[in-house]
Amino acid sequence: MPMLLSKNRECLDQSNEVEKFKSNIFKWAEKLDVEPKEIHLRSMKNKWASLSQNGRLTFNTKLLEIERELCDYVIVHELLHMKVPNHGKLFKSLMFAFLPDWEKYSERLKVDR
């Protein structure tokens, strides 16, 4: 019986983390003036996140385990793609406007892979 309680608590803790994560996405979406159509979390081997052409955002479940500022970087990066589809000058200037240290976070995520 204690094992079952432990698993339930783990599920509850993970559920709370997912809700906090999604809440953070909506906070950033409001700041960036974008409206994600769908948000999903799943295990991904080679990506931190992706945005489909129809506005579906998918985030790697590993984001639930890393530092908040790195998470914010991934969230802002993907949400900005709803406004700017490429990584050109406009995209980079918006990244700097919302996350001045975004390049540092990007490098840290590459190293952590």
Please name every model-derived segment.
Residues E78:
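Walker B catalytic acidic pair
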Residues M1-Y73, M82-R113:
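Active-site-proximal or metal-binding-adjacent scaffold patches in catalytic folds
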